[in-house]
């Protein structure tokens, strides 16, 4: 039986110290265009999006959920934050044991990937890729940095969910406060048009 995946509620960004503000920033999956007041029993499936060219060539099984350091040797540049979310099916039932992978650019707009030929500098302390397994309640969390825009794209974080060798969903998460950049991003706008 095939299950449709919903990320509910949409993942949130929580600024980490020293930027610990009262306000929680919302990092939305493609659910951005959907009404936030939907009941858990009436969830809408998170739309799939492209994997993109910078998924790791060899995903690091030991990467863990902290993208802000590589082997504990210093901290990544950029504004530290946490991505916190929960994966359910469209009835609201938690999906435990899923592998959640994320990857994104560093604070300069460059991916940690050999095919990214951007002139932007690399950050030796930013991993660029992380992985976590959903708990019994479908929850996951990541420590990373605020994503930044680069030419042609709004700030975003790529996300892939799988169980074993079976890919269940590839999507992207967006910042609701990046309204001008979001409006210029074709992939983001295609989600709004489809909703």
List where the protein language model places each region:
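N-terminal secretory signal peptides
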Residues: 1-21, 28-36
């Amino acid at each position: 039986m095939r299950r449709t995946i919903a990320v509910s509620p949409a993942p949130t960004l929580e600024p980490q110290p020293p930027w610990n503000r009262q306000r929680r920033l919302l990092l939305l999956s493609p659910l951005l265009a959907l009404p936030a007041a939907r009941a858990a029993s009436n969830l809408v499936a998170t739309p799939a999006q492209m994997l993109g060219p910078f998924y790791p060539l060899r995903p690091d099984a030991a990467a863990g959920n902290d993208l802000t350091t590589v082997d504990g040797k210093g901290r990544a540049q950029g504004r530290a934050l946490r991505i916190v979310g929960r994966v359910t099916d469209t009835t609201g039932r938690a999906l435990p044991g899923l592998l959640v992978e994320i990857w994104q650019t560093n604070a300069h707009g460059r991916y940690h990937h050999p095919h990214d030929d951007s002139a932007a500098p690399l950050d030796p302390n930013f991993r660029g890729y992380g992985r976590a397994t959903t708990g019994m309640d479908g929850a996951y969390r990541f420590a990373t940095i605020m994503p930044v825009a680069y030419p042609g794209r709004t700030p975003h974080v790529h996300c892939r969910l799988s169980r074993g060798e079976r890919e269940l969903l590839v999507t992207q998460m967006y910042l609701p406060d990046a309204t001008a950049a979001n409006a210029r991003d074709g992939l983001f706008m295609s989600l709004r048009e489809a909703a």
